[in-house]
Amino acid sequence: MQGSVTEFLKPRLVDIEQISSTHAKVILEPLERGFGHTLGNALRRILLSSMPGCAVTEVEIDGVLHEYSSKEGVQEDILEVLLNLKGLAVKVQNKDDVILTLNKSGIGPVVAADITHDGDVEIVNPDHVICHLTDENASISMRIRVQRGRGYVPASSRTHTQEERPIGRLLVDACYSPVERIAYNVEAARVEQRTDLDKLVIELETNGALEPEEAIRRAATILAEQLDAFVDLRDVRQPEIKEEKPEFDPILLRPVDDLELTVRSANCLKAETIHYIGDLVQRTEVELLKTPNLGKKSLTEIKDVLASRGLSLGMRLENWPPASIAED
């Protein structure tokens, strides 16, 4: 097989070894050298942490107020019962949140098949033992909440949303992922004269809620969707929004009354229709001294007050007055 030095080999599905209904081995080859570990590790991490599924999240057991207790006639303590419920494998169609019920009495094991559910729910492991009743008169009733989610979510991370939950509603660590075990191995592969290629062997076990091949297919889809953003890589940063600087310093738009001049000086300025500080700073000393009743003492006062604000007489302001003042 002769090709361009820049052309990468694409793997093809070589074999699916179905060990059981929940256990399979998938072999992919050929892969370029190093790609076996690159792809195998990425798929393994997604399969372990990011696969969606359904899990028990809350339980209510008649006569039980908290998980650190026991129930008469039940061999296991409540913590062990909750642990067994975590092992329940459930498929739910068309819903993200369902309530299941269980009612059992008499001596013997209580199994997943004893759970009552509607047609949208399938118990994958009906023989899974939840607890044992040890007395003919013993009974147990519970309401089991099953929700759809992703990965593993401990009960402690959900307590902040359950501050007002009723007494007796027990939270369960939710293991949504249907994948129970995943391992991969990279072996040597050969294509014609090339002997430096990889063969990826993925071995996967699920709880039965999802077939192993479908789990790998979904993990590969998730990985491909995440990498799509890099295929058409471009700068997607938001353009900088430049703040428009005001045309005039805000202090120039304030009335001369804000300068707190003496009554004499203020009245002289108003008589000359000088209403804003912007009007005042454009006047020269000579112009102000021509104002009736405004002498050198008042002029000095005005100059000092303007100087304290970083202003002075004789300034030139383009486009004065602004439209907001001109309209007034």
From Swiss-Prot:
One of its GO terms (molecular function) is DNA-directed RNA polymerase activity. Belongs to the RNA polymerase alpha chain family. It catalyses: RNA(n) + a ribonucleoside 5'-triphosphate = RNA(n+1) + diphosphate. CDD domains: RNAP_alpha_NTD (cd06928). The N-terminal domain is essential for RNAP assembly and basal transcription, whereas the C-terminal domain is involved in interaction with transcriptional regulators and with upstream promoter elements. GO terms for cellular component: cytoplasm; DNA-directed RNA polymerase complex. The keyword Hydrolase does not apply. Pfam families: RNA_pol_A_bac, RNA_pol_A_CTD, RNA_pol_L. Gene3D superfamilies: 5' to 3' exonuclease, C-terminal subdomain (1.10.150.20), DNA-directed RNA polymerase, insert domain (2.170.120.12), RNA polymerase, RBP11-like subunit (3.30.1360.10). It comes from the Bacteria. DNA-dependent RNA polymerase catalyzes the transcription of DNA into RNA using the four ribonucleoside triphosphates as substrates. Its EC number is 2.7.7.6. Homodimer. The RNAP catalytic core consists of 2 alpha, 1 beta, 1 beta' and 1 omega subunit. When a sigma factor is associated with the core the holoenzyme is formed, which can initiate transcription. This is DNA-directed RNA polymerase subunit alpha. Residues 1-234 are annotated as: Alpha N-terminal domain (alpha-NTD). Keywords: DNA-directed RNA polymerase, Nucleotidyltransferase, Transcription, Transferase. One of its GO terms (biological process) is DNA-templated transcription. It is an enzyme of class 2 (transferase). Residues 248-328 are annotated as: Alpha C-terminal domain (alpha-CTD). The gene is rpoA.
